[in-house]
């Protein structure tokens, strides 16, 4: 069955996001097949930084200024520095059409992003960000062009051929994701100790949460990779797709080596040919204690694990073991 190429790979049963304020989030996903932590971490990082859409200033027009190499009387920063500061304004904007924003201020004082007058569908996310500083008697008026896009667009590409004199193009940093880092560690699943654990830190400009950013990046990868799938997935027979009505708890189909038992306890169960939880719970305490090298400490450990699942030793299970137990275990694995 070709489906086994992807169906039998382990998938994370733990995907947790922890937010730290408006702009920072941490993702932990485990377990992953060996090597998949690096594969997924690197792919997600690249897409997060390059391919998500956001808003940015594309051009600015400053009253009395003809080009970016000018200076403005009474303004401490020259126009080049002002343009660099404008690049760092964090913006959230709905819609795809270009919008205008205006700021007008008299000195003395500092001009910040919070001084900008915006329309209803534009939000300044870092209003404390400094644009320039005015001396006594100085005045400045700037009009910004804002657009939506993705990635990084240099000023030259924002320069329109029919642009009026004095319209200064700006490098546009559209990506709402500012920083992404990740690390891969070993993690345990059952008795397997070398699965991957992916930890990722995401910092955004506040226009999107880290969790949503990862979801969008994953969807982009899913869409891009889908074009390489050159086959239709084989259809199972109708009777195979129908879920068999079980006479017992599906959790009994879970293998005991997936329980987080000590090595000693796990080896004792293996030596006694106890493969599934359904095999285990039918044993009595006395039967377990007669198992070679199995002591009271191992017994208490197993009783505690079973109790956490609502089970205990000495249970009667009708119709156990079922026919095709391995197929049933795979079919019901999402239910335990």
Curated annotation (Swiss-Prot):
Keywords: DNA-directed RNA polymerase, Nucleotidyltransferase, Transcription, Transferase. GO terms for biological process: DNA-templated transcription. It comes from the Bacteria. Residues 1-232 are annotated as: Alpha N-terminal domain (alpha-NTD). It is an enzyme of class 2 (transferase). It catalyses: RNA(n) + a ribonucleoside 5'-triphosphate = RNA(n+1) + diphosphate. Pfam families: RNA_pol_A_bac, RNA_pol_A_CTD, RNA_pol_L. GO terms for cellular component: cytoplasm; DNA-directed RNA polymerase complex. Residues 248-336 are annotated as: Alpha C-terminal domain (alpha-CTD). Its EC number is 2.7.7.6. GO terms for molecular function: DNA binding; DNA-directed RNA polymerase activity; protein dimerization activity. Signal peptide: none annotated. CDD domains: RNAP_alpha_NTD. The N-terminal domain is essential for RNAP assembly and basal transcription, whereas the C-terminal domain is involved in interaction with transcriptional regulators and with upstream promoter elements. Belongs to the RNA polymerase alpha chain family. Homodimer. The RNAP catalytic core consists of 2 alpha, 1 beta, 1 beta' and 1 omega subunit. When a sigma factor is associated with the core the holoenzyme is formed, which can initiate transcription. NCBIfam families: PRK05182.1-2, PRK05182.2-5, rpoA. DNA-dependent RNA polymerase catalyzes the transcription of DNA into RNA using the four ribonucleoside triphosphates as substrates. HAMAP family: RNApol_bact_RpoA (MF_00059). This is DNA-directed RNA polymerase subunit alpha. It comes from Rhizobium rhizogenes (strain K84 / ATCC BAA-868) (Agrobacterium radiobacter). The gene is rpoA.
